């Protein structure tokens, strides 16, 4: 029985670009819900493979929204999104220079998200998958 379990785990090479793209979309959509964002608009619907090397591709997704408090500053909105993201999926900060976009990655899901609120009261989130096998 142990040999069967060991062999069955060998074929799992991780998600395809399509699978990771669907996960990315779900994470960003859920993030907007958890942030209680208003007037959410998809800026990049994703869902298509972008070639990035030998039989591999990546996918993207992005959205913008408004905050209930239009005077909320971009850095504060990014921090709010960061807090909400922790209840959506495990991402780690890879770049946060303060008063600038926050870049996060998930090794588990093979995705990257950038929190980049551009102006007072406006959320902006975009992301992409790693370069993964095409589906």
Language-model region placement:
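Extracytosolic low-complexity repeat regions of secreted or lipid-anchored proteins
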Residues: 71-135
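Functionally engaged cysteine thiol sites
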Residues: 10, 48-57, 111, 129-133
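Compositionally biased P/S/T/G-rich terminal and signal peptide-adjacent segments
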Residues: 19-62
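C-terminal motif of bacterial Sec signal peptides marking the signal peptidase cleavage site
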Residues: 5-9
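Generic structural signal for short, solvent-exposed loop/turn connectors between secondary structure elements
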Residues: 13-14, 45-47, 97-98
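Terminal, regulation- and interaction-focused segments at domain boundaries
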Residues: 10-16, 51-83
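Sec-dependent N-terminal signal peptides
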Residues: 1-2
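Generic preference for hydrophobic/aromatic residues in regular secondary structure cores
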Residues: 42-43, 58-67, 115-116, 125
């Amino acid at each position: 029985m142990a040999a069967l379990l060991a062999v069955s785990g060998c074929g799992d090479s991780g998600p395809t670009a399509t699978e990771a793209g669907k996960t990315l979309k779900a994470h960003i959509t859920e993030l907007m819900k958890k942030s209680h964002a208003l007037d959410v608009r998809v800026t990049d619907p994703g869902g298509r493979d972008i070639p990035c090397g030998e039989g591999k591709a990546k996918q993207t997704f992005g959205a913008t929204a408004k905050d209930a408090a239009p005077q909320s500053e971009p850095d504060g909105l990014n921090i709010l999104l960061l807090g909400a993201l922790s209840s959506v999926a495990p991402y780690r900060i890879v770049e946060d220079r303060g008063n600038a976009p926050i870049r996060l990655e998930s090794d588990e899901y093979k995705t990257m998200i950038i929190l980049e609120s551009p102006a007072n009261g406006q959320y902006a989130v975009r992301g992409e998958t790693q370069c993964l096998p095409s589906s």
